[in-house]
Amino acid sequence: MARTRTGLAAALVVAGMLAPLSAFAQQGVDQQINDAVKPYADAVSGFIFSSFSVAGVQVPFVLVWLLAAATIFTLYFRFINFRAFRHGFQLVRGDYSDPLAAGEVTHFQALATALSGTVGLGNIAGVAVAVSLGGPGATFWMILAGLLGMSSKFVECTLGVKYRNEYTDGTVSGGPMYYLSKGLAERSDKLKTLGKVLAVLFAMFCVGGSFGGGNMFQANQSFKQLVSVTGGDLSWLADKGWLFGLVVSALVALVILGGIQSIARVTSKIVPLMAVVYVTAGLVIIFLNISEVPAAFAAIFAGAFSAQGIAGGVIGVLIQGFKRAAFSNEAGIGSAAIAHSAVRTNRPVTEGFVALYEPFIDTVVVCTITALVIIITGTWDPSVDPSEGVALTSAAFESTISWFPWVLTVAVLLFAFSTMISWSYYGLKAWTYLFGDSLITDITYKVLFLAFIILGASMQLGAVIDFSDAMIFAMAFPNVLGIYFLLPVVRQELDEYWADYKEGRLKKFGKAANRD
């Protein structure tokens, strides 16, 4: 009850501070801010998303950077994404989970927290845009990229646990900031300075990304979807973004003030719920159009290798699919390693196995269902504006059952909320890495995070959000570069653990022990 009052009080204080801004937004202040930030945002975004041309298609360098790493990791660890898939499920189920191990959350809770940060609006809006611009064949390449991305998650989450800081009060702090600085210093004195620089860069990018893509964008897009289903411009909510932002910030405050254990408890409930809501709705549409399913899969496979009418041909299709997978599951970005590092385990590689499920669920399952719905209903549109992805998916849902956009709205709200609470944790850990772990730095970050929710819902700050989105993908450069130096460390952890697993030397707990 005390935490509830504290959360509401924090949100009300933030609302009071921002009320004048939301009013000024009606007078164009948000446009002035947007115009002032735009030149810098465009420069940063242009640099981070710099591209080169292949068959007339612009290929972002960051996309190649992420996919090359995923492919290298898959080969280096001998297709661990497939070999350890079954064992990962055993760990999620708790078969080998020592309740006395260091850490704050279970394997399942860590996975749910990380999933809540990746399974979001990109799975709904981004897939619709990818299929529209790349055709049904983009789905094939999206799935392939998701499978490769599993190896990236394995590596970064193993390192996140291995190099985390464990404190006397039982809390932990981990993620790329720690394995870049501590891991590279451990490898060689010559790499110590590089590790510190990469860690600071990652933390700075992570803080920026948490305020935009992990916060303002989520609040902005979920508010737009709610307005859309309640009457559009005529909706009584149309000019009340500040009110929506206030309510959401209060709900977020109730969760994040309790730390990772509170976040994990909530996400472990929300993630299964939102997955069931969205996946069930998608499967209902697929079932009602079951006769179209064979043709849809035929179009996916045919379109993957023979793309007529698609800009850039097969290369264009491949890029759209790979782009959506990479931008959706964030494999190689490093964000998920922060959540996974809080797990209770004494064997770092176990969380790497659990993390394999993140890209699989996010991309291979959820994104594929969205793609099938778009293809089967025939609502994909090559002329679609990238900002209209949610509307396109909503139209696909509505084409089968008129009230299904409401189901989609519930999913959007759940996706956005869960993404915000997860990214608040990512940003906080990066913030405290930069400014120290104290009560003041903790409260300062959380108040700022809650403030940005209200701003995101009530103001149109496109350039600010674009800049922050660029920060998320900028995280990939220091993260992946550092990981290359640490691959032998992960290999040693894997070989030692896998030998114990294969020879039956691992202790089982709970129901798993009783089954033996």
What are the functions of these language-model segments?
Residues Q26-Q27, E156-R164, T168, A281-A299, ...:
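Extracellular/periplasmic helix-exit of transmembrane alpha-helices
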Residues A68, F73-F89, L198, F202, ...:
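Membrane-interface loop-to-helix entry segments
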Residues F79-H107, V129-V131, G135-T139, S151-K192, ...:
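Flexible loop linkers connecting adjacent transmembrane helices
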